[in-house]
Amino acid sequence: MRTVKKFSIAFAKWVFIACAVGVIGGVVGSLFHMAVNFATGFREGHSWTLYLMPLAGLFIIFSYRVCKVNEETGTNLIISSVRGNIKVPLLMAPLIFLGTVLTHLTGGSAGREGAALQLGGSIGAKAGELLKLDEKDSSLVIMCGMSAVFAALFGTPLTATFFAMEVISVGVIYYVGLVPCIASSLIAYKISLLAGLAPTKFNITGIPRLSLVSVT
């Protein structure tokens, strides 16, 4: 009976934490989705923004220097923070948000997957710090943040869940994070739908015929 009670308390605790992180991650991910879409649409309609790319790059570097955040800080830091007790600076989130939007606005090359992990990881790390969680629990809440922002950004809660569980270590899945991560992902995904954001889709226009030429 004591074991069941202990498990129930732990389960309820993590569902609550995961949902809270999912709400925050859903809002941030939805705003990020809107900002990137706006920046991309504006650039496509105003090609002169390409000439602003050098200035945007200088501004991004300047922002990192002013905020005293290493420019090389990125997805690797988030992964390291899950593996060990490495602190993630909170300022990393707005810097990644602004830097990615400016890059898309000026025609630069920047993927959204890494930005989603970094945004979510920063949110999760701060949540773990505020809740005074130990190293193991902090790692789990960081994964929840990663799942939440990824789900809100791409509209793929299941993919977000397993991506966050797998990206930490190649060939290893952190099954302990399944329930919290999927809870965060579903909450964040629902928020993105409420914000009017449709899941990202990629249309396949044609499938090449299978032949020696196509497989070599």
Where are these regions (language model features)?
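Alpha-helical transmembrane segments and immediately membrane-proximal extracytoplasmic
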Residues: M1-T216
